[in-house]
Amino acid sequence: MQTIYTKITDIKGNLITVEAEGARLGELATITRSDGRSSYASVLRFDLKKVTLQVFGGTSGLSTGDHVTFLGRPMEVTFGSSLLGRRLNGIGKPIDNEGECFGEPIEIATPTFNPVCRIVPRSMVRTNIPMIDVFNCLVKSQKIPIFSSSGEHHNALLMRIAAQTDADIVVIGGMGLTFVDYSFFVEESKKLGFADKCVMFIHKAVDAPVECVLVPDMALACAEKFAVEEKKNVLVLLTDMTAFADALKEISITMDQIPANRGYPGSLYSDLALRYEKAVEIADGGSITLITVTTMPSDDITHPVPDNTGYITEGQFYLRNNRIDPFGSLSRLKQLVIGKVTREDHGDLANALIRLYADSRKATERMAMGFKLSNWDKKLLAFSELFETRLMSLEVNIPLEEALDIGWKILAQSFTSEEVGIKAQLINKYWPKACLSK
């Protein structure tokens, strides 16, 4: 029998303190107001008989005499095939006017997958984006963020990746979204044709911070079930992890916790790692590939959120000036697939293209400062223009093999075969015969 408590001793922000016994961290409770309305709350901490709870939806209209009932279980989300094509909020309730979701209730925020059952990833996730496929391959089960400067179209990039990969299921977790962002996700998933294999967990900017914290846990709990029980390859997209961290900061400040760097809680690294470590490829099972967006306030890479994220993840895509910056981006798992599941020329060609593009940036600086340009500088500048137009632009949408062929053509149009620094065996096989050496 559940005990009802009515001694709410303190209400501060979205937190309440109630005198109760037997509560557990993370336990779910219901609060019934005097007018009959009810809402959920979650136990954040307890001190003897004083239990502090975070109220979902805020404490507006709450009084000290309202009823608090502990449910004896943590937060859960409904899991099942009926989730596909649905949109839910931060507490797992449908927001798409399509009725209730039916299925099995599962716990969220469970421990990460047993490392013994993990396997070393060997498969490439194709995106048809040359700056990813050619230079920083996305590997199945990889955890990787998109570091985005302000004003960049990171949501459009996420949706494009979701539409063009071969994932069986796409799980999207949106945190701190404006109505415009939310509408964009809904419309683009329908327009690009993957809405039926997608489930969205959405926290809007006007919703309670605790719902923001729950969104990645719900998204990852469902993804893990799909991967383990149904052996599906799941792509999880989370945006924006900076909003997630800001929600953690707001909650910790309300709880009077001692702040760490720039006001964020000292547990920020662990809180981020707990979510990122859900990425996994399972032996004789499915996989979870995790791509997130981390916006950088004032384009500051040393901000605590991107700074901590870089120590956890397996690389990053740096989105700047509506391009994936090749110098700030990195995939630490690309060596597992380049030349093994891709063409033999992949690694050498990518290295040559990036090396020459780096040299072209120096030539651009010399031109801007008014120095006299050499013939080599002029070749580099011509190469740079072709490279940025035909490979770097996010408008380019081509398979990996075609991107590699274009890379060879760009080199042949700008340099002689002796100038590119690629071994003769590959030059003889892949150098375009139709392009005359200059």
From Swiss-Prot:
InterPro entries: ATP-synt_VA_C (IPR055190), ATPase_F1/V1/A1_a/bsu_N (IPR004100), ATPase_F1/V1/A1_a/bsu_nucl-bd (IPR000194), P-loop_NTPase (IPR027417), V-ATPase_su_B/beta (IPR022879). GO terms for biological process: proton motive force-driven plasma membrane ATP synthesis. SUPFAM superfamilies: P-loop containing nucleoside triphosphate hydrolases. The keyword Transport applies. This is V-type ATP synthase beta chain. Produces ATP from ADP in the presence of a proton gradient across the membrane. The V-type beta chain is a regulatory subunit. Coiled coil: none annotated. Keywords: ATP synthesis, Hydrogen ion transport, Ion transport, Transport. Signal peptide: none annotated. GO terms for molecular function: ATP binding; proton-transporting ATP synthase activity, rotational mechanism. It comes from the Bacteria. Belongs to the ATPase alpha/beta chains family.
